[in-house]
Amino acid sequence: MARRTNTRKRRVRKNIDTGIAHIRSTFNNTIVTITDVHGNALAWASAGSLGFKGSRKSTPFAAQMAAEAAAKASMEHGMKTVEVNVKGPGAGREAAIRALQAAGLEITAIKDVTPIPHDGCRPPKRRRV
């Protein structure tokens, strides 16, 4: 019988000092991806990947934790400064930006890149609670 060896990949430190932090904040979750300037992902985290379930994923605290986790992982690759691209209407937008700054990343620019339709698809019906 052939014996399986441990084939877990080791992370290679990349030494990238500037990058882009993409914050996708929806009504249900917040996803933070940190890339280099070409768009290649270095680190990511989301509220759901950190163990938040259900309506707790959409809280600003969950977004803060996701941003901290992504920032720590990217700083292992030597990341120091980031531009921030924020997309979506969710509750965790500002909390995620503050968490990136508190984690030790220097923020050079903040852009809102939320896609706005020029009267495209019909929106979902209004909620009646």
Curated annotation (Swiss-Prot):
GO terms under cellular component: ribonucleoprotein complex; ribosome
Keyword Ribonucleoprotein in record: yes
Annotated PROSITE patterns: RIBOSOMAL_S11 (PS00054)
Domain of life, source organism: Bacteria
Biological processes per GO annotation: translation
Cystine residue pairs: none
Pfam families listed in its UniProt record: Ribosomal_S11 (PF00411)
GO MF, one example: structural constituent of ribosome
Keywords from the named record: Ribonucleoprotein, Ribosomal protein, RNA-binding, rRNA-binding
InterPro entries reported for this sequence: Ribosomal_uS11 (IPR001971), Ribosomal_uS11_bac-type (IPR019981), Ribosomal_uS11_CS (IPR018102), Ribosomal_uS11_sf (IPR036967)
Quaternary context: Part of the 30S ribosomal subunit. Interacts with proteins S7 and S18. Binds to IF-3.
Family: Belongs to the universal ribosomal protein uS11 family.
Role according to the record: Located on the platform of the 30S subunit, it bridges several disparate RNA helices of the 16S rRNA. Forms part of the Shine-Dalgarno cleft in the 70S ribosome.
PANTHER family in the cross-refs: 40S RIBOSOMAL PROTEIN S14/30S RIBOSOMAL PROTEIN S11 (PTHR11759)
Protein name in UniProt: Small ribosomal subunit protein uS11
Organism per entry: Geobacillus stearothermophilus (Bacillus stearothermophilus)
